[in-house]
Regions:
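Sec/Tat signal peptide C-region and signal peptidase I cleavage site
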Residues: 22-26
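Bacterial N-terminal signal peptides
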Residues: 9-21
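N-terminal secretory signal peptides that target proteins for export/translocation
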Residues: 1-9
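Outer membrane pore-forming secretion/assembly proteins and partners of Gram-negative envelopes
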Residues: 27-205
């Protein structure tokens, strides 16, 4: 009478062990995915018809971006003016605020830049390839606008500067990994220029 009970107990024990192992293996990819980290590279390109400075030359990694822009816009020159490198985890959020690192700007009236990136998630696309989805993205700048001039007590001429906010915001972006992607464009204070925002997401191994 005890033998069937013993066999049943052994079978039940083995079943529980097998179930635990199956659950553990099933959860491993999810855990690995949730712990993945990524580099967020945001770059600002300025398109114009003026001669580009060699110090702001577009790197080879953005050559495909410039080629695509040339097919849609008639600007003769493109230059890289700002680069921001941040780090984020899968399903994470990112917020950056700071003084722009754009060259040749007025040190007494700098440009302030900020961008936010919410709910970055690694998920397969329609072809089964890993891609990045972003729930919301915003890029903004506070740019100085000269509104008037005045002279101080010494007779020196000074500018009156007010700051205006410009930017773009969007929801539900999809990007391929390791691929520079044009997010959008903004006008600048110059009528013959256009600013392009380029975003690249790279996995950190």
């Amino acid at each position: 009478m005890n033998k069937p009970k013993f066999i049943f107990s052994i079978a039940a024990f083995l079943f529980v062990c097998l179930l635990s192992l199956t659950t553990s293996f099933a959860q491993t990819p999810v855990r690995q995915q949730s712990e993945s980290s990524y580099e967020v590279l945001l770059q600002v390109l300025i398109a114009s018809n003026t001669t580009a400075d060699k110090s702001t030359a577009v790197p080879q990694t953005l050559s495909s971006v410039v080629t695509k822009l040339r097919t849609n816009y008639s600007f003769s020159n493109y230059r890289l003016t700002s680069t921001y490198l941040q780090r984020i985890a899968n399903r994470g959020n990112l917020e950056f605020k700071g003084v722009s690192n754009e060259p040749n700007q007025d040190i007494y009236a700098p440009i302030f830049s900020e961008f936010t990136l919410g709910q970055l998630t690694n998920s397969p696309d329609s072809n089964g390839q890993n891609s990045i989805s972003i729930q919301n993205f915003r890029f903004g700048r506070r740019v100085p606008i000269k509104t008037a001039d005045y002279k101080d007590d010494s007779g020196k001429s000074n500018a009156v500067v007010n700051y205006e906010s410009v930017g773009l915001a969007m929801q539900k972006l999809n990007l391929s990994l390791n691929t520079p992607t044009i997010i959008g464009n903004l006008s600048t204070s110059k009528t013959d220029e256009l600013m392009f925002i380029v975003l690249t997401i790279k996995p950190i191994k």
